[in-house]
Amino acid sequence: MNPNDLPRDVTLESPDGLLAAVRAVARGPLADVVEAIDRQGYYPRAELQQLGALGAMSAHLDAPAGRSDFGLAIRAMAEVSQVCGATGFMMWCQAVCGLYMQASGNPALNGEALMAHASGATLGGTAMSNPMKSYAQIE
C-alpha cells in the first residue's frame, strides 16, 4: 500500500486514515498470500514492512516513534487479524518488542534502532513475554 494511493481526503495523520490504509493492505497484498502463510509457512515480511511503514505497528509507542495510542494499535491489529490471524499475532510481537525497546532506558535500543523497528524497516519480537509480564507484575 502506497500512501499516495489513498483517497485525497484520507491521510495517515488521522486514525481513520491509518485504519483505512491498514485495511487496504490486509484485504489486498496480505489476503493474496494468506494461503501461503497458512499452508506453506510463508513469512509475510513485505506485508509486515508495509504495515510498519504506515505506522500500524508503532501507534502505541510514545513520540517520536508513535502516537501513544494503544487503542489505535489494537484496532490496526484487529483489521489485519480479520484476514490473517498469524500476521495479526506477528504485529503484536513487533508492537511488544518496540514497547520493551522504548521502556528499556537503553540508549542502544532507542534512537535509530527504535525508529527502524517502529517503521517496520527491521522486524522483531520478544521471546520473553511471560517472564517480562511476571517481572512487571501484570500477570
Q: How should these model regions be labeled?
A:
Residues 53-111, 115, 119:
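Internal helix-loop-helix
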Residues 1-78:
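Alpha-helical interface subdomain recognition
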